[in-house]
Amino acid sequence: MTTKKEINSGSQRLSLKQLKAWEALEYGMYIHFGMSTFDGDELSKGDKPSSLYRPNKLDVYQWVSVARDAGMKYAVLTAKHVAGHCLWPSQHTDYHVGTSGNTTNVVEAFINACHKRGVLPGLYYCSWDNHHRFGSDSPTFTRWESAFTTSAYRDFQTAQVEELLTQFGPLVEMWIDIPTLLGHAGRRQQYDQIAGIQPDALIMMNNGFGDGTKLMLDATWPTDLMSIERWLPSSAKGYNPWHQLSHSGALERADASQLTYVPDSPGAFYIPGEVCDPIGYEWFWQPDDKLRSDAELLGMRLIARERKTNFLLDVPPDRSGRIPKETVGALMRLRKSLERFDR
């Protein structure tokens, strides 16, 4: 039975005050940039040489300045995506910017720019890695239901995430993509590692596609946040952050295999929602991708706000390493449209 105390404060790791402070950020920039920008494949096979990555006008400061000027309060950068190429010089692989056509430590530059511009930084790390497989089988090479990671890969991920958490300062959010590949124990280990090193960071285990009405426990738990990817919150009810998870032991330590999900029930865990969607139709920059219309972008922004979720809008830099001027223009028009709407 859900107690009054649970309903008021929740059984989640972070306090309601911390979670509501994150909700108050409301609007952020998602930045997909890396090897996929250069090989043109969002789900890159990880077989391209590091030298293919070579932005010739890289301007990380521009990215964060655009985010601030667009009214965004936080930003999340893809430190490592499916290609496995890292935007920092990791000590655990040679497949990173340090061996590429532009050796800038992008993660470091991004964090520094965020501090200078008053934007809170977050980082993204993908558990689907086609370059560093260590015997794992990713969805690129097998069916989704057969994909898995080995303990050797999970040790590699743990070591890299430790670098990200200890070398660059505090993060507002740590975004783990495709966490289903880690398995129940692997997700718990990953969650505990992040919470142990940066206890104030909110941890996102990507819940994938859906309107936020159901937390995919077998693929996502444990998590502090609910991702609503390429979707919008339920039109009938908006997003309900209270998720009832039933377990006979300590809820905050429960594994997904020990939990049952009770939909549409207020109670145990307060899990804020975050809509994430691109400003165009692709996560990474593509030469033929089109920006969404001004009206569609305003609608997405307003719906996310009215249905009480944060909005993480993906704004991918191009191969030069800058956000294109057309994209910047769309963001500034969106801010002005929102300001007019709020008068």
Kindly give the residue locations of the regions a language model identified:
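Mature catalytic domains of secreted/periplasmic carbohydrate-active enzymes
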Residues: 1-343
